[in-house]
Amino acid sequence: MIAAFFREIAVAIQAIWNDKGARSTMLGATLFFAVFFPQPYLSEVVRDMPVAVIDQDGSTLSRELIRRIDAADAVAVTRYAADMPSARKLFLKRQIHGIIVVPPQFERDLLAGRAAPIVAFSDGGYFLLNSVMSSALSNAARSLGAEVQVGRLTASGIDMAQAMAIVEPLRVTTVPLFNPTGGYASFVLPAVFVLILQQTLLMGIGNLKAGRPSAGGLSPFADAIVYVALYSLWAGVVLVLLPWVYRLPRIGDVAIMYAVAVPFLAAVTAMGFAVARLIPSKEGVIFFLVVLGMPLFFLSGVSWPAEAMPQVLRTVAFAIPSTTAVPALVRVNQMGADLRSVETTIFIQLALCLAYSMLAVAAERWKKKPSA
């Protein structure tokens, strides 16, 4: 029995290597996506976004405001425009990504204690660019306004310390936990890595099993063990090694990570068997999984918070292993969660593994029934 089981394991390994589609997906594509997908995001934050300034005041304070905006890491004042039409031309040519307008009498209104509105235009189609420009402008305007107000109070005879307390009665210190740089890569890549594991494993199983009858006996168990073992190695590469290479924050215990990852991979494997039994052709499985890729990303709760999803979608999403595995693995790897914090996810993954295994067996028996 044991010798026969190990022979089946050897057959499963050989099947992966001999099948071009499975080999390219489970070996090549996993490494390719995991290594090359992060490249555009490795700078973490936006730096030196080019903007144009229309200074209609030309005063000392307007120039100081522009200097402070330009001093921000995220923004660089690269152009000075005479009017809005010329700035708009630069914007449409993509030579700049934002326009800042300092109004006339800016300095006079500011020194008189009146509101001095500043107008900013940015590309709302790119939320990162829009947010960094708004942040740079707000910080510069706030610091300059506070400095002018403190100067006005001290000129009226108020002590400097008291004036600063009046201008800023509450000093807030923000500490970005688990993502010190506030970077986009540190936010999105840990979740994407988990989805890469899921999608390539499902596609590999689809290449190997779709349209082919089950060998029966010990073969399905041997196949499942080989797939889970192979992707357990990939989990170490993708969830431990690559975050270290890319300097992504990771403080979790590797043993706890595997306590979640192995049941997750088992559930994905069982799902792959079920999909391969329900969809008769290899091409159909691949098409189904490619179409499903983007919805799975949204259902994972990374870019679309689960609290904002319709209840129907939230319920359906629990049938996908990544829905609960992604936040659990992120909590373990990036936030240092302990085993008790993710034990519910482990039970969900085991339940999904059992449910999809039963579905795969039922689908196989249903397909064989007409020929009996």
Segments and roles (model prediction):
Residues 27-31, 192-193, 224, 228, ...:
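Residue-level signature of the transmembrane alpha-helical core
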Residues 1-12, 79, 164, 177, ...:
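Juxtamembrane loop-helix boundary motifs flanking transmembrane segments in multi-pass membrane proteins
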Residues 100, 135, 203-208, 269, ...:
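Short helix-terminus and kink motifs of transmembrane alpha helices
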Residues 33, 37-41, 199-207, 234, ...:
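Structural signal for membrane-spanning alpha-helices in multi-pass inner-membrane proteins
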Residues 58, 89, 240, 249-372:
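Membrane-spanning alpha-helical segments of multipass transporters and channels
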Residues 2, 6-10, 186, 217-225, ...:
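Alpha-helical membrane-protein architecture signal
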Residues 35, 175-244:
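Hydrophobic alpha-helical transmembrane segments of multi-pass membrane transport proteins
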Residues 1-184:
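Extracytoplasmic/periplasmic domains immediately adjacent to an N-terminal transmembrane anchor
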